[in-house]
Regions:
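Short helix/loop capping segments that flank catalytic or ligand/cofactor-binding pockets
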Residues: 21-23, 31-32, 102-103, 121-125
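Extended, Lys/Arg-enriched charged tracts that mediate electrostatic binding to polyanionic substrates
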Residues: 37-105
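Glycine-rich phosphate/pyrophosphate-binding loops
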Residues: 10-11, 15-33
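Conserved small/polar residues in nucleotide/adenosyl-binding loops
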Residues: 194-201
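Generic, well-ordered alpha-helical scaffold segments in large soluble proteins
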Residues: 8-12, 16, 116, 170-184
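Carboxylate/His-rich catalytic cores and anion/metal-binding grooves
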Residues: 106-108, 115-135, 173-181
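Active-site-adjacent bridging/hinge elements
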Residues: 137-154, 182-188, 197
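Generic recognition of stable, solvent-exposed alpha-helical segments in well-folded globular domains
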Residues: 4-8, 108, 161-176
């Protein structure tokens, strides 16, 4: 499918020794198993990370912070419009890097997969009050973003989750690209086709 096509792009660029980084979400159950039951295809979750993956290198020190929900407040300060985002839910995008080798070359590129985690594992105040499920809401919301590829979207919850996945992926990736560019060039004024090109492989998140 399109995911395989994106992998071919990255592998080909590596073979041609073109510096590139691929981005996606590190789905816990990204590839489903298929079985035939009573003549019908049945999809089952495939816990592909259960046995570990020696090729994935987590880099929590390079995590990006994504904000969901909340409200926006504006104010003027010395003639400048200030926009303040408040009361949002924080989700961390933890990068897990995989090196991609090409053919007949020593050049290596990187595939960066984002794993969604809550910076606050549990709300101890709610947990102490006996509200155990509510105490885990933020963690459950964050975990759901990178749990499974292609969640059903024939209901509101599914549409909401897909939108969160898309926003999470785009925000984390653009933050990462921006941060790396500033670290290299010291400014965003040099962002141009000379230094940066982006290609999107349209996946049905």
């Amino acid at each position: 499918g399109l995911g395989r096509l994106a992998a071919c792009y990255l592998e080909s660029m590596t073979t041609l020794e073109i510096p590139a980084t691929g981005y996606s979400i590190c789905y816990e159950l990204g590839i489903f198993k298929q079985k035939i039951v009573d003549g019908q295809q049945v999809e089952l979750p495939d816990d592909w990370l259960n046995l570990g993956d020696a090729w994935l290198m987590p880099k929590p020190q390079e995590a990006e912070e994504i904000h969901f929900g909340g409200r926006v407040r504006t104010r003027w300060d010395n003639g400048h419009l200030m926009v303040v985002h408040e009361d949002y839910t924080r989700v961390l995008a933890i990068p897990c890097d995989m090196l991609v080798a090409g053919y007949n070359t020593d050049h290596v590129n990187t595939l960066r997969l984002w794993d969604a985690k809550s910076p606050k594992p549990i709300d101890m105040q709610l947990f102490s009050q006996g509200q155990y499920l509510k105490a885990n809401e933020e963690r459950a919301m964050a975990d759901s973003i990178s749990t499974i590829l292609y969640p059903e979207d024939n209901h509101y919850e599914g549409k909401s989750l897909r939108l969160k996945q898309q926003y999470f992926f785009v925000s984390a990736t653009l933050q990462s690209i921006t941060r790396q560019h500033i670290q290299t060039y010291g400014t965003l004024k040099t962002v141009s086709y000379t230094h940066l090109r982006a290609h999107e492989t349209s996946l049905h998140l």
